Amino acid sequence: PLSHQEIQSLEHNHCQAQDWQLITVAENFSPDSIYNVCFIGNCQIGSTSDTVTTDLGIELPSGIRNARIINSSIGDNCLIENICGYIYNADIEDNCVICNVFTIQTTEGTTFGQGNTIFRLPPPVGCGVAFLGDQYEESDSTTDRRRQAKEAIKRMVMEEVTRTIPKRTRIETGARILSTDEITNSWIGAGTEIR
């Protein structure tokens, strides 16, 4: 948890928390790089000892400025500033730049697209295969076994999906999100840039 001195420094920098005991920080955390931030719920903050390089090649100090962070983790050496709404239920990895964004959030019950049924398209015209009647006949027992097998596979897939669905938005290492209104229920890959 934060030390008493770190809490005082954060409050001096116009930061507040619903409960300072729910905020954890990395070893190289510096409260001087956090300004005008409201923390709600369990939040983890990484090291803020380094700089980040913008797409224009400008070196800026890492840190969090002008933001509301709710139940989220922020990795080492990120620059997060001017979040007009909030960052809610997100895991932000190291060296990310997130500036001038309204909201990043994860909503209740999201599946991140996992477990959705996708129907295949019919084959293009002229690509079909002609079957003769006796080649394609199936007995009722074969059809029933196939149906049962499909249902068993679907049930196994849905059990695995339910077990492994992420509960939070994830922003991987080095991603940049700039001047964007809303990111909801997303998994943003390493090095991705969103404008």
In which residue ranges do the predicted regions lie?
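Domain-scale signature associated with acetyltransferase and cell-envelope carbohydrate enzymes
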Residues: P1-R195
